[in-house]
A protein has these predicted regions:
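Absolute N-terminal positional cue centered near the fourth residue
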Residues: 4-5, 31
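Polytopic transmembrane helical bundles with strong interfacial aromatic enrichment
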Residues: 23-151
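A generic alpha-helix propensity feature with a strong bias for hydrophobic helices
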Residues: 8-9, 133
């Protein structure tokens, strides 16, 4: 009875067991999931730093900017983990790889520019955030297209 899990046949039928995945798919899935987990850990650290280390040092508006960076950082760290799991379950198509890559770029550009803006007050960094936001949008659209293309 140990091997009678109700989803076992279903998972195997959909090619989701590790043995049925190609090496590239496993590498991509591991990269996305582990990167997402590390990025999430960093997001938690940045959130704690903002709440405890920056509260007395930043103006309220700049603290809000920092918090916005943390929020999008965390949403998209979880998005990276999700994309990695989808890659593991469905295989790592080009669209899924691009989705993961753009999500990571979005975190770096969007959240990163907000972090630096909050710390330095350098206004031109606000112009970088939309590039990161566009990366997020394209990443989610590519993921949707990749899922719609699966049979």
């Amino acid at each position: 009875m140990l091997n009678s899990h109700p989803l076992k046949g279903s998972i195997k039928a959909h090619g989701c067991l590790k043995n049925s995945l190609g090496k590239d798919t496993i590498i991509v899935a591991k990269f996305l999931i582990s990167t997402g987990a590390l990025v999430a850990a960093l997001g938690i650290a940045f959130g704690a730093f903002g709440a405890h280390g920056l509260r007395a040092k930043l103006e309220p508006r700049m603290l809000e900017v920092w918090q916005t960076g943390v929020e999008y950082h965390m949403y998209h760290a979880l998005g990276l983990i999700l994309i990695g799991l989808i890659s593991h379950w469905l295989g790592s198509s080009t669209l899924i790889k691009w989705s993961g890559g753009l999500m990571l770029v979005g975190i770096l550009l969007f959240s990163g520019s907000l972090y630096v803006l909050a710390l330095t007050g350098t206004g031109w960094l606000g112009a970088i955030a939309p590039l990161g936001g566009s990366s997020f949008i394209i990443a989610w659209i590519l993921l949707a297209v990749a899922l719609l293309r699966t049979s």
